[in-house]
Amino acid sequence: PIFDPEFSESSFGYRPHRSAHDAVRQVQTIIRGGRRWCVDMDLSKFFDRVQHDIVMRCVSREVHDRRLLRLIGRYLRAGVMVEGVLQPTEEGSPQGGPLSPLLSNILLDELDKELERRGLPFVRYADDFMIFVRSERSAQRVFASVQRFVTQRLKLVVNEQKSSVRAAPGCEYLGFAFVGKRATIQVAPKKLKAFK
């Protein structure tokens, strides 16, 4: 309850009453609004690469109880079992852990606020996000500047093989494709093929 009211309206993952379908409909609305190019970014091994100091800095902006902050720090550093041996964790957030979804949203809210400050329409579901612009040239510039922000400010890695600039009609997000000028929502061909 402390953080969620402050999160962006464009953030959908791991939040109450904000489903993947809501995110997909938001993408459709943005494309229909005239944003014809998208920057589709994938963060490489997001949960494994979360920097503890950056997450703790973000959390401490709203949480001032030192005991709670220490507990969250311990959660992040709890370690993982590798072949029966406990290995300490210097970075990353335990995948499947109860706090990890919230901590990921707290960290990526930094990105959301930056995109809002720049006036860029976007949709983010957990660590999967798309940014929308009007031209290919703008999309290329936004890709480069957001990649810099993610790398320098959040100390995360953009997976360049899975990230791209492309025309928004025809793009795919969360397993759905947006077809034609009306951005009609269809199951993405890859997902349909996998289902068969």
Model-derived features: where do they sit?
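Conserved polymerase palm-domain catalytic core
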Residues: 6-172
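Basic, alpha-helical interaction scaffolds
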Residues: 182-196
